[in-house]
Amino acid sequence: MSTVPPPLSVLLELTHRCPLACPYCSNPIALAALREEMDTAGWRSLLEQAAEMGVLQAHFSGGEPMLRKDLPELVAHARALGLYSNLITSGVAGGEPMLDQLQAAGLEHVQLSVQDVDPAGADHIAGYRNSLSKKRAFAAAVRARGLPLTLNAVIHRHNAERVPGMIALALEWGAERIEVAHTQYYGWGLRNRAALMPSREQLAATIVAVETARRSLGDQLAIDFVTPDYYARQPKPCMGGWAQRFVNISPRGDVLPCHAAETIDGLQFDNLRDRSLADIWNHGEAFARFRGTAWMPEVCQGCPKREIDWGGCRCQALALAGDAATLDPVCERSPAHAGIRATAEREAASPAPDFVYRRPERPAAVAAEAAISDTE
């Protein structure tokens, strides 16, 4: 029986429930309901299977994973299995009692999202009041417990000018790393693309801000930087290559090669209730479909970067070129490349429409101010 090397990491999307409503959320448009979430036994089994395969890292995400009362149990189980555990959180749910439980369970790292350094801007983007002050308190609680902290800052036209402030905030809050990542336009991000797309000038300014900070700060702060695909000439290796290093588990227990894979019609996604993780990883239809290079069109087959970018993003190829098996339109060899560049420039130059907030109860567009939750 043929096998492939195991994934390096597994992302556990424990829930799609979340206090925030960010318009660029990587969750699918069709959010899983509470009643659809896999139970504790299912997640424990998943961790056991991952460890047996040789997976090294377990990333607990959502939605907001701290809304799951069994999160400390799952973190403890990961620790007992020898898996490195990382929490990806909004920092506005759970509070210090939950953080104490997670530390006791063996949690090893925290990634905290930050929408903006401006309080009003942060609330507008998150669709949640007083978000920045709550995140500040959460970051302080994380550092007080000696846990390593990374800030995740998603960049777009509404906050691009404040990238220097976000880097300064990471230092102020005691983070060891910040990821400055331009919005990736899948799912909710694609739906809100016209509201989020930065201009080329804004992108250039963020590049300067990051490079300047890297030179001045040295080893004080690690800065990861992700540019927006729409202004690129070469595709990035999505998730390190389709079904190469990463596996995503949805709240329902579906096993996915990436966050947005369910947007590709015609692929069969297996569920942990029906097949083992190893069987799905090694032999599942969805994983085999775009793994490696055999699937690539002729122009990709002859490219010297074919085993570097692995053909780019399949979900983006479908969304922008209409075919998941064709060139990623980010690639300058794609016939669709000039069109997506023109789309980005046109949308960035136009007035930003209201956000369509990530809300399961109201998937249609809503006015920005009307959608902000009153959580006080």
UniProtKB/Swiss-Prot annotation:
It comes from Xanthomonas campestris pv. campestris (strain ATCC 33913 / DSM 3586 / NCPPB 528 / LMG 568 / P 25). GO terms for biological process: pyrroloquinoline quinone biosynthetic process. Its cofactor is [4Fe-4S] cluster. Transmembrane segments: none annotated. Catalyzes the cross-linking of a glutamate residue and a tyrosine residue in the PqqA protein as part of the biosynthesis of pyrroloquinoline quinone (PQQ). Gene3D superfamilies: Aldolase class I. This is PqqA peptide cyclase. Keywords: 4Fe-4S, Iron, Iron-sulfur, Metal-binding, Oxidoreductase, PQQ biosynthesis, S-adenosyl-L-methionine. It catalyses: [PQQ precursor protein] + S-adenosyl-L-methionine = E-Y cross-linked-[PQQ precursor protein] + 5'-deoxyadenosine + L-methionine + H(+). The keyword Magnesium does not apply. Binds 1 [4Fe-4S] cluster. The cluster is coordinated with 3 cysteines and an exchangeable S-adenosyl-L-methionine. Its EC number is 1.21.98.4. Residues 4-219 form the Radical SAM core domain. Pfam families: Radical_SAM (PF04055), SPASM (PF13186). CDD domains: Radical_SAM, SPASM_PqqE. Belongs to the radical SAM superfamily. PqqE family. [4Fe-4S] cluster binds at C18, C22, C25. GO terms for molecular function: 4 iron, 4 sulfur cluster binding; cyclase activity; iron ion binding; oxidoreductase activity; S-adenosyl-L-methionine binding. Pathway: Cofactor biosynthesis; pyrroloquinoline quinone biosynthesis. Interacts with PqqD. The interaction is necessary for activity of PqqE. InterPro entries: 4Fe4S-binding_SPASM_dom, Aldolase_TIM, PQQ_synth_PqqE_bac, PqqE-like, Radical_SAM_PqqE_MftC-like, rSAM.
